[in-house]
Structures are given as C-alpha cells and as structure tokens.
Amino acid sequence: MEKLNQDKESHRLWHRLNERFVKAMATYHLIDDDDRILVGLSGGKDSLLLLELLARRAHVQHPRFKVEAMHVRMANIHYETDTSYLEQFCSNLDVQLHVRTTSFEIGNPTNKRDARRQKTPCFLCSWNRRKVMFNLAQALGFNKIALGHHQDDLIHTALMNLTFQGRFDTMPALLKMRKMPLTIIRPLCMIEEQDIKAYAELQGYQKQKKLCPYETDSHRSDIKRLYDAIEQINPEARYSIWRALNADNKLLEE
C-alpha cells in the first residue's frame, strides 16, 4: 500500500512539474523546432529533473528538438559527483553525456580594497563551467544551453540584486548571447523548489557525494534565509515578486 501511495504521489508531482515546464516553454518561447539543446548537468536534483523533463519532451511531436547533456568537473573544488550515476541516468533517458574537467585560481587579497574587487569562488566556478559549456556547444553545433535554475533561484537573485546592487532584475528565462550564436534557457523557471525536492525524494535521485565547501559562504545563502522570513510574513510573496518581474520584462533578454 505504501509503494502504491508513493507511485500515485510521484505521478501527481510529475504531472504538476511537467505542466509548469510546458507553460514556461510556451510563455517565454524557450524551444523551437530543430533546436539542439545542451543541458548543464551538475548532478544536483534541479539539473536531473531538467534533463528528465527535456528528454521526455523531445519525444513529443512538436516542437522536435535534440537533447544532450554536459557535466563539468571542477578539479580544485572539493566536492564530488558520482559520474557513473550520471552516465546511467543519461543512458536510461537515451541522452548522450559529455564530461569535461577544468579549474580556476582562487585569489588571496591582501587588503579590504582588493577583497571587494575579488570575485567569489561561486562566481569563478560558475563562470569557468559555463566557458567550457559555451566552447563545447559551439564546437558540436548546439544553439541552446539549458540551465536548471528554478523559480526560487530567480526570486532569490532578484532580491540579491535589489539588496546589494540597487537594481531589480534576475536571471532571465531566455537570454540570447550577444557575442556568440547561443541562447541560454531556464525551463524550470516556473517550478517551485519544494516540488523538485519532493519529486527527487520519491524518484530516489542520488545526491552528490560531497557538497561544495562554499555552499553556505555567500550572499545567496543569506538571501534564502531572508526570503524564508518574508514568506512567513506573507505566504503570497512569491507570486507578488514573480508578477513584478514579469511586468518589468525582466525574464526575457533578447
């Protein structure tokens, strides 16, 4: 009986996730016929779900598109993903996986002025991963890169930019690169993190072996706590912030 209930809940969640995924595709015109999409597969729950949604959708008649995945190892950051698990996950979805390794230097500023200018490890890690992805995508003829940022990520980014940069914007659902023939899409942009967590638990998505040592050492972790407090004050805050982002056209950058 317990297994039956879990299957029912998993099916219900999948329907909800897929419905919001399809709505995001239509709302922000994320995917077109003949697209070749490279998915950034970190090994976390968000990227695993993103790949599953796209891989299943690729078998639907319209739009017809091709999906492959890429995992970038960061040699000098001590966290670990089970690459064999990612290979099996991709194989089950009939998706080709590309694995690359890169690294970056973390500076040691000697004064406060240099420290303010110093890029965070999170920024450097993300930027260097994307450089590898951009290079591979262009070399293999992909025209779109799909990243696994969900609605909570976009809302947190908006609050970070408002708090620390004095501007109200976020990571767009669709971003056309100016210096290369690539478009970044975020198909999970209308999906809540709590639904992803619940589905990942039911599906038994494997967690990373070791978490990133910088995971809690950033403004983003502070903003997450702030946002949790905001939701305690107003449980509808998510929808208010999302409406504001849409009203100001912050989710499309062409």
Positions of the model-derived regions?
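ATP-dependent adenylation/nucleotidyltransferase module used to activate substrates
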Residues: E2-H156, F164, Q194-L202, L252
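Electropositive phosphate-/nucleotide-binding environments in soluble metabolic enzymes
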Residues: H11, H15, L48, W127, ...
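Residue-level detector of flexible, active-site-proximal loop/helix-junction positions
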Residues: M74-N76, F104-I106, L175-R178, I191, ...
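A short, charged, Gly/Pro-tolerant segment at domain boundaries
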Residues: S218, E236-E254
